[in-house]
């Protein structure tokens, strides 16, 4: 049985931990509001960008479309870009994204495909390296970045473009977590390359589900200057950066939501543990006092 001193030390230790978890919860809550606004603001822009590309693609011969849009025409080598958080203490946030990527890797390997993995975020790299270290070709570290901006998305986009130009892959899929609510973050697989399906329509959807390409925009007839093909040459790389930027913003919002929830649960658990330890301490102290009183009374009677 633990002594009174041991129980006092444990209570003090748990209280100190509870102060830390409460502080982290407050910090995550403050950051969540800003991150949530940024993620929500990026969604319509990314969606409109996809709709514009869909409209442009209808006016351009697939042969004249940028290579990023039409792809290589093969389906042999798959690049998986897995975006997770740089830090932990956010519940199952990172594990869910890595699990989604791992399931996709297993499916591709079972189909005889070649898989390459590019990780963004330390936690995803740590998780995937346990089973698929041989497949990981590079890692992008954003730990020193205090606030993710478009520059970071452009850097990741350029890395993907460089790999594509080197004929390093045929298909590129982006994995991240879509922010649904504070307690709900949904892991998503999003097709980046190619952007054009076999039917000629721009694919800006998840691997399993296509994003709405805004029928109202597609029904409008546009005049392009100098021409649609020239605009695609500029907008396709830009769209790649925009979609990655949106994914990074969604990830930040999801991470803050998961961290706030995890720290709230940790604080509650710490409170329950403090109550249990306090009850144990009081019972043991009461028993000790009772024993001392009995000894005093017994000694007095002996006299």
UniProtKB/Swiss-Prot annotation:
Keywords on record: ATP synthesis, Cell inner membrane, Cell membrane, CF(1), Hydrogen ion transport, Ion transport, Membrane, Transport
GO MF entries: ATP binding; proton-transporting ATP synthase activity, rotational mechanism
Any one GO biological process: proton motive force-driven plasma membrane ATP synthesis
SUPFAM superfamilies: ATP synthase (F1-ATPase), gamma subunit
Domain of life: Bacteria
Membrane topology reported for the UniProt record: Peripheral membrane protein
Subcellular location: Cell inner membrane
GO terms under cellular component: plasma membrane; proton-transporting ATP synthase complex
Pfam families listed in its UniProt record: ATP-synt
Homology family: Belongs to the ATPase gamma chain family.
Subunit details: F-type ATPases have 2 components, CF(1) - the catalytic core - and CF(0) - the membrane proton channel. CF(1) has five subunits: alpha(3), beta(3), gamma(1), delta(1), epsilon(1). CF(0) has three main subunits: a, b and c.
Role of this protein: Produces ATP from ADP in the presence of a proton gradient across the membrane. The gamma chain is believed to be important in regulating ATPase activity and the flow of protons through the CF(0) complex.
Protein name: ATP synthase gamma chain
Lineage, broadest ranks: Bacteria, Pseudomonadati, Pseudomonadota, Alphaproteobacteria, Hyphomicrobiales
């Amino acid at each position: 049985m633990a002594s009174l001193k041991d129980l006092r030390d444990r209570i003090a230790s748990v209280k100190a931990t509870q102060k830390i978890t409460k502080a982290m919860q407050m910090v995550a809550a403050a950051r969540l509001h800003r991150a949530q606004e940024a993620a929500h603001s990026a969604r319509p822009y990314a969606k409109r960008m996809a709709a514009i590309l869909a409209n442009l693609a209808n006016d351009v011969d697939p042969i004249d479309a940028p290579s990023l849009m039409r792809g290589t025409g093969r389906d042999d080598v798959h690049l998986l870009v897995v975006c997770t958080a740089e830090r932990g203490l956010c519940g199952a946030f990172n594990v869910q994204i890595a699990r989604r990527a791992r399931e996709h890797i297993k499916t591709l390997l079972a189909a005889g495909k070649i898989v390459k993995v590019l990780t963004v975020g330390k936690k995803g790299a740590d998780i995937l390296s346990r089973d698929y270290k041989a497949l990981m070709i590079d890692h992008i570290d954003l730990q020193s970045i205090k606030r993710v901006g478009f520059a970071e998305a452009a850097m990741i986009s350029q890395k993907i473009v460089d790999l594509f130009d080197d004929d390093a892959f045929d298909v590129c899929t982006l994995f991240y977590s879509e922010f649904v609510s504070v307690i709900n973050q949904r892991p998503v697989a999003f097709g980046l390359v190619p952007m054009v399906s076999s039917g000629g329509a721009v694919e800006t959807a998840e691997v399993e589900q296509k994003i709405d390409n805004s029928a109202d925009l597609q029904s409008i007839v546009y005049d392009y200057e100098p021409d649609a093909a020239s605009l695609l040459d500029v907008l396709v790389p830009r769209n790649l950066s925009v979609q990655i930027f949106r994914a990074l913003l969604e990830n930040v919002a999801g991470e803050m939501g998961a961290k706030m929830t995890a720290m709230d649960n940790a604080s509650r658990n710490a409170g329950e543990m403090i109550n249990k330890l306090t009850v144990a301490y009081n019972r043991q102290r009461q028993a000790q006092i009772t024993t001392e009183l009995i000894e005093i009374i017994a000694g007095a009677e002996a006299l």
